[in-house]
Design a protein with these regions (language model features):
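Small/aliphatic-rich secondary-structure junction motif
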Residues: 2-55, 154-218, 237-239, 266, ...
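Glycine-rich phosphate-binding loop signature in dinucleotide/nucleotide-binding domains
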Residues: 104-109, 233-237
Length: 278
């Protein structure tokens, strides 16, 4: 991959969400000094409709050429417009298997995926998204479903809970250094208090650890994820950072509690799921 501080791997298909994911990756790369690779896996069963082996091979080759041409056109267009180099590759195969093999081989710092409009309520139940959250220990950037950031320069950063805000992940620290806007911290309190107006810390000892932070506290209860999502949109966040649980209680867990999952599902803001490091 390109020689840069970070390496972004953008997973695409032929959906609009893939285009949004690539644009978000480009905007992020400009700010944090990252190289970009685009990877596209297409299942053969989407192409093959013949029993004759020769016909199958011919069809696969035609589809490979057509798919690579379409991908090259998309990547080259964005690369030329944004003046940033992008490398890309394409293959046929099982989507999850090929992606896992490619991640193992290239070791990207951030995997970037689009957010499809879910047929069901839970977007995070999507096969690839769920697989990555369970198995990939690095950062995952989930692009907004219908939102493309104009720039990550001076981006408005939001954090879901204190552990996300205080996380020492390097990419988050780099983004913090490149913004002058107050951070937004969204917390769900296990109390009977009402939703508070946004407040800022005023005590010196608190300022030293979480200075320049606006806090939104929500009562745990009915529709708290709706309330959080509403305030995320209202504050025009550019990126929401979410920390996975260090020790997952279940082997099948994606490392996000129910409230975090619901909030991600209901917001269009790009979400950076932070590395699951012990």
């Amino acid at each position: 991959m390109l020689e840069s501080k970070y390496r972004l791997l953008v997973l695409i298909d032929q959906t609009k969400s893939s285009y949004t994911a690539l644009r978000n990756a480009v905007n992020l790369a400009k700010v944090i000094d990252a190289g970009i690779e685009v990877f596209y896996v297409k299942p053969p069963m989407q192409v093959v409709r013949y029993d004759n082996q020769i016909a199958v091979m011919r069809t696969l080759e035609e589809e490979r050429i057509a798919s690579k041409k379409a991908m090259r056109k998309l990547v080259d267009t964005i690369s030329d417009i944004e003046n940033i180099p992008i490398i890309y590759s394409f293959t046929f195969g099982n989507v999850i298997t090929e992606i896992q093999n490619h991640i193992t081989k290239t070791q990207p710092d951030v995997v970037v995926i689009g957010k499809r409009k879910p047929k069901m309520v839970n977007f995070l139940g999507d096969g690839l998204t769920s697989y990555l959250l369970k198995n990939h220990k690095g950062e995952i950037l989930i692009s907004g479903s219908d939102k493309n950031l104009t720039s990550y320069h001076d981006v408005s950063l939001g954090f879901l809970d204190d552990t996300s805000l205080n996380n020492e992940v390097e990419i988050v620290q780099d983004l913090k250094k490149r913004t002058h806007k107050p951070f937004k911290l969204f917390k769900i309190k296990k109390t009977g208090s009402q939703l508070k107006k946004p407040i800022t810390f005023s005590k010196p000892e608190e300022q030293s650890s979480v200075a320049n932070t606006v806090i939104f506290e929500f009562e745990e209860g009915m529709d708290d994820s709706n309330s959080v999502s509403k305030y995320i949109e209202k504050n025009k966040l550019g990126l929401l950072c979410v920390k996975r649980e260090t020790k997952q209680k279940l082997s099948k867990s994606i490392g996000l509690n129910d409230k975090a999952q619901q909030t991600i599902n209901k917001t269009n803001v790009p979400v950076l799921v932070l590395a699951n490091k012990k």
